[in-house]
Every structure is written in C-alpha cells, then in structure tokens.
Amino acid sequence: MDVIVRKGEIRGKAKPPASKSYTHRAFIAASLSPSARVVNPLISEDTISTLNACKRIGAAVLKKGNEWLFSGVDGVEAEGYFNFANSGTTLRIFTGLLSLSPFRSVVDGDESLRKRPNGELVLALSKLGARFKGREPYTPPFSVQGVIKGGEVEIEAPSSQFVSSLLFALSLAEGDSSLRVEKVKSQPYIDVTLDVLRESGVKVEREGNFYHIPGSQSFKLRRYDVPADFSSASYLIAAGLIAGEVVLEGMFESAQGDRKIVDICREMGGSVEWDKKRGVIRAERSELEGVEVDASDIPDLVPTIAVLAAVAKGKTRIYNAEHLRIKEIDRIEGIHQNLKALGVESKPLKDGLIIKGGKGEFRGVVDSFGDHRMALAFSLLGLLGEVKCRNAEVVSVSFPGYFRVLESLGASVIRL
C-alpha cells in the first residue's frame, strides 16, 4: 500500500499504542510463568511473532478483552522450526531460550531478518554449552541446541537484544552466571528487560557493565500492564510541532529510553509540555532549530529526529548511531535517500548524519524500504506539502492504525 499525506493543520487528542519493547518481554515472561495476564499489550506484526513463539514453546494463551491470559511452561524443551518473521527482538531472545532445550531447533525469519547478524550472541551462548550450525555471522536460518549452564561470560553488544537474551536465558540455566557487557548500545532497552524480570520475581544484580544472575530461578509474573510506547508517541509529537497541536494521553514514566524525545524536542525549541502525574504530553507548532543528538541509546528515535531536523533551521548532527546500519535496513542510508528525495541536504556519516534543514514545504516520493519507522516518520512531512510514501503498510509492525490516528487529528491521507 502506498499513502499520500497532504498539507494541512492537525489538532486533537490521541493515545499512542502500547510499548512494543515492553509487550515482547511481558509476553515472554508470562509464557515462562505458571499463570499470568498481560494487560493492554501492543498487538502488531512483531509482537504477534513473539506471541506465536510463546505458543510454540508450549505456553497456552487466551485473549479476553484487552487482556491476554497465559499458562506458561516449566522449562524450555522446544524443538522444530521457528519463523520469527521481521522481529529481531523475538529472534534474539528466543535464540537464548532455545539454548536451554536439549532438542534441536531452527530459527528463521523474513528477508530482512535474514540480513541481521547474531555472531556475538551465538559466541556467548556457545561458551556456555549451546551448539549452533549456520554460516557466520549467524544470520538466519541457523540451528540451535542446548543445554547451556551458568558460568562466566562476556559479550560485545552492538545490539542490546543480545544482552536481554542472555538475561532471560541465564536466569533459567542451571548454575549462577556472571555476565560482562562491552560496547553496549541502547542501554535503556536492557533496563526495560530488567524491569520486566523484576516484576516476574527474577533477580539480577547489576554493577556497572557486570551482571550477576542466579541460576535455576522461576518466573512468577502475575499481571503486567503495558505502558504506552514513546517511540510511537514521537511521531505524533513531531506532527504537533510541525503542523498544529497534539495532546497525547497515557504517557506515564517508564524505563523506555525513547522518553528522551521530549527533551530533544525542547532542545530544538519545540513547545512540549509533559504532565507526568496525569500522563499527558502536549506538543504545539514551533520554530525549530538544529541540534546535536547522541543517539547511542535511542536508535528508534533517529527517523523522527531526522524529520524534525529537515524542518528545523540550521544543521542537526546525529552521532553514535552506527548500530542503525544493522536494523531492519541500513537506516542511516535510508534516511539519507528519503531526505534527498524531498530536496533536503544531508550527509551520511559512519555513525550518523548531518542534516541541513529549514525547508518550509516538502513534496516528493519517499520509500519505507520495508522499515516501519521510515514510513511512520517520513509520511509526516506531507503535512507541510504533499508526500507519497511507498510500501507504507509496514507501519503495522509497530503502530497498526497509524494513518487512522493521523486522520482523526485532521490529516488528509489517501491510500493507494
């Protein structure tokens, strides 16, 4: 599906979807607990991949309104073929969990996931006793077979998902573990994992980049209410800043690193108010200026920041974002190509971009390149002109109903 977004003012209230990061982890923790309910999860293509994987390892799942009821497994003894579609989080965490099973499994995904390397995670799990067969750097498909045992292990973590995988798996492994993490990116996503583990009664002690994980623990999640997603909220905040006024509800504090979007927008001169007690964020049209942004912990915000940078006066430099080159696509190159298509000057760097903004109108054709965050972000620039986004259906990966939400705020959206 292609989408055209046309110039117009937006105004109104909206509630962003539930957090994708929290939903993944809550589903997995629930599937490892005797009896748990996950309330108000995000149901999207990626989280459905996790839900299906939870069922494949033996969890029973029942939907009841906006609650998902789980009867979980006592230990992982799964085998067979696992297709995780486009979900990197599902792939990485379940690679760790399947390392607990004495039986052989094959993990796979779609064309995009088959390009995402897992070498550092495979190396760490292999040192703990897992066996893998595949081609380095272990892009899917590859096979995994346990059983890992606790021990001392270290990992270079270009993806925080590798660390999350080890934290889940080692808490169930026989024997205590010490995990040393080097060159970590996106620490807040690890904090989200620790938050869910803590709610599940799983103990992890952290000291700097060292984690001590007692072995043979039991998951005891009872109920988890999934908070709103700040990554998804970032697009609506950006819409308010460039084209009117948006009030977002249900935006309470959490461990999500992407809550930093509020501070970044303010640094750019944006009028953004956040009432944390009421969980309300208000964003109004503002004159924006370029800034420098360290994206090491906020990779999913970079497309949003790039769109705001295109509007802002002056230059914006985004750095420490080299991990964007191994996301669903090479996001640095994808952002550069879409900015170029809209007449915005940008320079891709090894670890980010420099964007020269200040345009008041945007007309042209952009492409999602199969990446949901590209479609979510770049379609917004149509509010200041007319932008056609190719392959926009991928928004369903993290924000189903996105264009309906824009329409409810007054945007003109044409589906082709």
Curated annotation (Swiss-Prot):
GO cellular component term of the entry, any: cytoplasm
Q: Where is the signal peptide?
A: none
Give the matching InterPro entries. Answer: Enolpyruvate_Tfrase_dom (IPR001986), Enolpyruvate_Tfrase_sf (IPR036968), EPSP_synthase (IPR006264), EPSP_synthase_CS (IPR023193), RNA3'P_cycl/enolpyr_Trfase_a/b (IPR013792)
Principal location = cytoplasm
Please write the reaction equations for the catalytic activity of this protein.
3-phosphoshikimate + phosphoenolpyruvate = 5-O-(1-carboxyvinyl)-3-phosphoshikimate + phosphate
Localization, per the record, is:
Cytoplasm
Q: What class of enzyme is it?
A: transferase
Residues annotated as binding 3-phosphoshikimate are K20, S21, R25, S159, S160, Q161, S186, D300, K327
Q: Which UniProt keywords are listed?
A: Amino-acid biosynthesis, Aromatic amino acid biosynthesis, Cytoplasm, Transferase
Question: Which molecular function GO terms apply here?
Answer: 3-phosphoshikimate 1-carboxyvinyltransferase activity
> Which CDD domains does the record match to this protein?
EPSP_synthase
Give a single Pfam family match: EPSP_synthase
Please state the pathway this protein functions in, per its UniProt record: Metabolic intermediate biosynthesis; chorismate biosynthesis
Which GO BP terms sit in this record?
amino acid biosynthetic process; aromatic amino acid family biosynthetic process; chorismate biosynthetic process
Its domain of life? Archaea
Q: Which residues form the active site?
A: D300
Which residues are recorded as binding phosphoenolpyruvate? K20, G88, R116, Q161, R331, R373
Enzyme Commission designation: 2.5.1.19
Q: What HAMAP family does the record tag this protein with? A: EPSP_synth
The entry's family comment says: Belongs to the EPSP synthase family.
Describe the protein's quaternary organization and the partners it interacts with.
Monomer.
Q: What is its biological role? A: Catalyzes the transfer of the enolpyruvyl moiety of phosphoenolpyruvate (PEP) to the 5-hydroxyl of shikimate-3-phosphate (S3P) to produce enolpyruvyl shikimate-3-phosphate and inorganic phosphate.
This chain's protein is named: 3-phosphoshikimate 1-carboxyvinyltransferase
Could you tell me which species this protein originates from?
Answer: Archaeoglobus fulgidus (strain ATCC 49558 / DSM 4304 / JCM 9628 / NBRC 100126 / VC-16)
Q: What are the top taxonomic ranks of the organism?
A: Archaea, Methanobacteriati, Methanobacteriota, Archaeoglobi, Archaeoglobales
Gene this protein is translated from:
aroA
